[in-house]
């Protein structure tokens, strides 16, 4: 008897968690809704069952959120690239900047999502830290960038351009499709097929879901956070920070611009939830201000009590949130509207050589 009661209580608890998923009209219908006269009698029933479905299990939702954030924090160091001493290599820094500037231009050209660009940068950095870039093969970084962007688009986008169509926006080198495909397989093998890393956007999404019910600016908040992230992602100085630290610093900076009613409370909750090192966050925050000097000036000039001042700041800061490269600015004016071009001739299916043979083929020639 005790076992039956325990099982019944367990089932009732499971149904309570799912009660919020039922539609209201379903609560009144039962198998015997027709009375003796053939009329519906569910309207005469008590509305208590309807009322109970209007409340979500908030406690369970917060428990799920806590589990999610703990999982993100525990996994972020597993797929977080760290150059270490290699960051001092001027040749590597130069190649990375050129390659990632091209990635961001193609992102704008085709209208890819911000997550696609961030994934491409993550793949690029993780792969480049695992090999030694040869100075006599400057085209290698461009090939890795093309393959990384192609893989990221296949993971995130609904429509993906052909490999030859992907090489737009003044690509320095042009590679055949089979060469890019070989590099794709080499990247997949090197990264052990772990193509869903934890990124700053992972934390943006979590915070928006967490505070979205009591804050009406979540869409604008997300847009500005992603824009600021894209503007600094090619800067190697930000590679020393974990995604949670970078995300926290970005969100604090955006909160200061949007100025919600409980700005200080939001910032405190974010820092507590993400369990980040406050000193690292402050250091990253100052670096963000240094990267966006116009934002720092405007934050000192805008009157916090003036709604018009906040609006003027938003309009004037847009230019500093774009990708801060001369090549990006010059190419954006000449780039057409985001459009996926399709070629009629399909690329031939490549054969799958061994990893060793593939590596030799890739390194032999850029063509």
UniProtKB/Swiss-Prot annotation:
Expressed in developing vegetative and floral primordia. InterPro entries: Cyclin, Cyclin-like_dom, Cyclin-like_sf, Cyclin_C-dom, Cyclin_N, Cyclins_cyclin-box. Keywords: Cell cycle, Cell division, Cyclin. Residues 324-335 have a biased composition (Low complexity). Pfam families: Cyclin_C, Cyclin_N. One of its GO terms (biological process) is regulation of leaf morphogenesis. The keyword Cell cycle applies. The keyword Metal-binding does not apply. Residues 324-347 are annotated as: Disordered. Interacts with CDKA-1. This is Cyclin-D3-2. It comes from Arabidopsis thaliana.
